[in-house]
């Protein structure tokens, strides 16, 4: 982990790195978000062909809350570059959570691709509302590493 005290101009490595370790292959690509309902930081981490979901109160100590992916979505390649975001449902007052998963290879036309899952998230566990359906963000053969930003100007 690294941190900044000057709004991202410079970074310092945390003295007690690593903050999280694993014996699993392909343990990478952490995405960290703030979960307002639980008042905790949430990290989604790619591990092989699954996503692991962790929580933390301080960004230094992490607890494994759940795993997602077994039996869901495409598994033609390594799962990478996860993202987790809450979005409004158009025309309603509802919101749903979207878990984004990039894989390489394994896309519908070969090469890399981005799949996504829509469902609920309670701060510990993501539940896919349609596990029998694989949803693709793009039908090209090289769409990859989709990311979102937090606190962007004008809520973009």
Q: Where in this protein do the model-derived segments appear?
A:
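Beta-rich carbohydrate-recognition and catalytic domains
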Residues: 1-30, 34-81, 88-140, 153-155
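Catalytic cores of secreted or luminal carbohydrate-active enzymes
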Residues: 145, 150-156
């Amino acid at each position: 982990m690294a941190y900044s005290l000057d709004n991202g101009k410079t970074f310092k490595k945390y003295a007690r790195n690593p903050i999280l370790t694993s014996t699993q292959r392909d343990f990478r690509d952490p995405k960290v978000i703030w979960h307002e309902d639980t008042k905790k930081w949430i990290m989604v981490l790619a591990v092989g062909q699954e996503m692991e979901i962790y929580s933390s109160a301080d960004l230094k100590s992490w607890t494994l809350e759940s795993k997602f992916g077994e039996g869901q979505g495409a598994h033609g390649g390594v799962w990478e570059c996860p993202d987790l975001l809450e979005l409004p449902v158009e025309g309603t007052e509802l919101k749903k959570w979207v878990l984004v998963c990039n894989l390489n290879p394994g896309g519908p036309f070969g090469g890399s691709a981005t799949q996504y899952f829509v469902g609920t998230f309670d701060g510990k566990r993501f539940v896919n509302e349609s596990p029998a359906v694989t949803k693709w963000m793009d039908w090209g053969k090289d769409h990859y590493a989709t990311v979102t930003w937090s606190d962007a100007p004008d809520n973009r």
